[in-house]
Amino acid sequence: MKEKSKNAARTRREKENSEFYELAKLLPLPSAITSQLDKASIIRLTTSYLKMRVVFPEGLGEAWGHTSRTSPLDNVGRELGSHLLQTLDGFIFVVAPDGKIMYISETASVHLGLSQVELTGNSIYEYIHPADHDEMTAVLTAHQPYHSHFVQEYEIERSFFLRMKCVLAKRNAGLTCGGYKVIHCSGYLKIRQYSLDMSPFDGCYQNVGLVAVGHSLPPSAVTEIKLHSNMFMFRASLDMKLIFLDSRVAELTGYEPQDLIEKTLYHHVHGCDTFHLRCAHHLLLVKGQVTTKYYRFLAKQGGWVWVQSYATIVHNSRSSRPHCIVSVNYVLTDTEYKGLQLSLDQISASKPTFSYTSSSTPTISDNRKGAKSRLSSSKSKSRTSPYPQYSGFHTERSESDHDSQWGGSPLTDTASPQLLDPERPGSQHELSCAYRQFPDRSSLCYGFALDHSRLVEDRHFHTQACEGGRCEAGRYFLGAPPTGRDPWWGSRAALPLTKASPESREAYENSMPHITSIHRIHGRGHWDEDSVVSSPDPGSASESGDRYRTEQYQNSPHEPSKIETLIRATQQMIKEEENRLQLRKAPPDQLASINGAGKKHSLCFANYQQPPPTGEVCHSSALASTSPCDHIQQREGKMLSPHENDYDNSPTALSRISSPSSDRITKSSLILAKDYLHSDMSPHQTAGDHPAISPNCFGSHRQYFDKHAYTLTGYALEHLYDSETIRNYSLGCNGSHFDVTSHLRMQPDPAQGHKGTSVIITNGS
């Protein structure tokens, strides 16, 4: 009885072993491996292989009981697959949603030292770094699918880095940290969807598993990697600041190593790729090694080259702390988009098509180097622009204008306009504008010369608050605002500048006949280049212009520079002033014939679309006056306010203001200035007699001057009356504070007078 039970147990074990042996032979493994497997390993491997049938239903064809005809192509495919697996610098693995390794190729032993049998069927979490468990869980998790239920299967790409356990010898393991090796894994998560019979529009999905390929990153030592012609290496600090670069970088990117040292890698990477580079940098600091995505490294001559980098953190041999970053970079393409500048460090191969001034044709400033030396203090520093300069963009703004939300300086914009190309249609000239920002555009109402239809359309009339004259003065000094720029109210069109700038005075006057008569107040035939004096004070207009210099480009052969533009503007405004004084002496009929009967020039602020400003600098109102009225008179060395003289309603011509300190004012202009100071004009003139040739300044203008700044080009008010006297005078004008300061900060020189300087009347805040 005892013998029978022993024999029965032995027979049962033999049958069990034979069944396990037969089962092991069904596994797609070499017989040398299967013959050494124990029962637990056979069950583990068999279970894992059965799960693989879910991922790949075709399986192994005949080995899974399917009879099919084999062709020579199938045999070639199998052999090719085995060879590809051997030549692959990595290993293939399939992981179930629960983390069990369903399959891993035998090449894993080359990179990790762990056998295929040992890994298959076990949890991948047992072989990865504990800090990477959460990342692995996120990779294996499938979110709610967004695909239609008609799609049965789809794949979600995955790319991640894992620190896997490595048991290889130190000389063969490459770079390891704490017994773990960084493996770059890339593959896809396979999702299968099923539709429900009861509800055709509903369905469920199944997370089949992850199929990925694991690659070992190259070791850090450069001596262990053969650098080919399309590769270069660099060493950087932990913040990616370059310390050392290989000499091959010069022929691949155009930069010499010394050009890149002490700059971060982010400084030379395309802006759209900095996010991917930042993520790779973060992974590098956490895991010690990383392979970047393809990114664009900017070339020196413009454009970029596509690069992929293998970066490694090198630890200090003594302290075992991170020391630096060593990266091997593969340049994958030639330079693309050559000449496209994306960085200040890049040099364009060809100059931009849009330009300010010509580099081949000499300009006026090139022929007048003697006069230019007198303006040496206003020479500006060169500034290289990374982008082509288009005329539609106002790139030159004063950095001292912090109150403006656009960061633009009014005087800088006036002194340095950007000119349009006359070759293009509709761009014969561009206006030089000085911007002022107004909190409420309704404070400026329409003038007398505006058509009544527009007054009715916009429903704005002169109120007691606006007082009419303030609006008229605002329109004269500020002009019409540019269309399409809502935040700016009061864009003054100083003067239209043509593209061509003739060198001679006669040619320049012929090209701009509408403003040439201003120049004659300094004497007939006088061409002055010293009319603009720079300012050493910060925040001035000249400093705004000094900060940048017009760059030499090629497609504008006759454009003036910023200094020449301001000089000519000053000279032409002076000429126009004398012309107005001469026209005042003509009879009304002659004035009407000169200015054109029925012609009205009154630019104002409105909501409707306005046409571009015309060439006339003076936009006079329809209020007539045969002679200027003296608002400011001197009695026994004192200045009296308009309230004391009852001249509140008589206009004062702005053209009569002059500077007694100027050394170039002619005798006739001095007589006019004297006549202005001592004449007593009665306010008996009525509106409508004849158009006023010069804009008039009423007593109501003073309140407008208190709020806004105006530039009186060509005169120095601070030398006609001192600031304290003007301040006392303003106390008589409704108690408002009135101050006169020079924006250019030009103090009088006892040895030399001012030559066509510019001042600004500003509020005293």
UniProtKB/Swiss-Prot annotation:
InterPro entries on file: bHLH_dom, HLH_DNA-bd_sf, PAC, PAS, PAS-like_dom_sf, PAS_fold, PAS_fold_3, SIM_C
GO MF, one example: DNA binding
Chain residue ranges for the region called Disordered: 352-428, 527-560
Ribonucleoprotein as UniProt keyword: no
Main localization of the protein described in the UniProt heading: nucleus
PAC domain residues: 292-335
Domain PAS: 77-147, 218-288
Keyword presence, Transcription regulation: yes
Stretches assigned to the Single-minded C-terminal domain: 336-765
Intracellular or extracellular location(s): Nucleus
Biased composition (Basic and acidic residues): 394-404
Top-rank taxon: Eukaryota
Gene3D superfamilies recorded: Helix-loop-helix DNA-binding domain, PAS domain
Ranges spanned by the short sequence motif Nuclear localization signal, renumbered to the chain: 368-387
One GO BP: cell differentiation
GO cellular component assignments: nucleus
Low complexity composition-biased segments: 352-365, 373-385
Tissue spec: Detected in lung, skeletal muscle and kidney. During fetal development it is found in the CNS, developing kidney, mesodermal and endodermal tissues, including developing somites, mesonephric duct, and foregut.
Keywords: Developmental protein, Differentiation, DNA-binding, Neurogenesis, Nucleus, Repeat, Transcription, Transcription regulation
All residue ranges annotated as the bHLH domain in the record: 1-53
Binding partners and assembly: Efficient DNA binding requires dimerization with another bHLH protein. Heterodimer; forms a heterodimer with ARNT, ARNT2.
PANTHER family according to UniProt: HYPOXIA-INDUCIBLE FACTOR 1 ALPHA (PTHR23043), SINGLE-MINDED HOMOLOG 1 (PTHR23043:SF22)
Cited function: Transcriptional factor that may have pleiotropic effects during embryogenesis and in the adult.
Protein name: Single-minded homolog 1
Gene name in the database record: Sim1
